[in-house]
Amino acid sequence: MGTSSPVTSDVALLERVAAGDERALWELATRHGSDLRDLAFTILRDPVDAERVVQSTFHEVRYEAARFDPGHFPVDRWLAELTRVGALQLSRSRSGYRSVVS
């Protein structure tokens, strides 16, 4: 009979990130980074930019984890939304897109 360690939930990891646990942030990045890079690459079509967006996403997670509401979004969806917004912002800044506010 093998031993296995329980998988820490994403919500529990975010709670630990909010408390300053860098290892929890690393675990979230390891768990979700590949999917987030794929998402960013789909938008940007550049692997270097995609990696930058994902790094920026986890930098934002470090500071926004305490505000996360697990009743509003699953963690993976929240991470994907942060990544999507970051990728779109980068894409727009590179294309000269300007938002017009009246």
Where are these regions (language model features)?
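Amphipathic alpha-helical segment used for protein-protein interaction
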Residues: 8, 19-22, 101-102
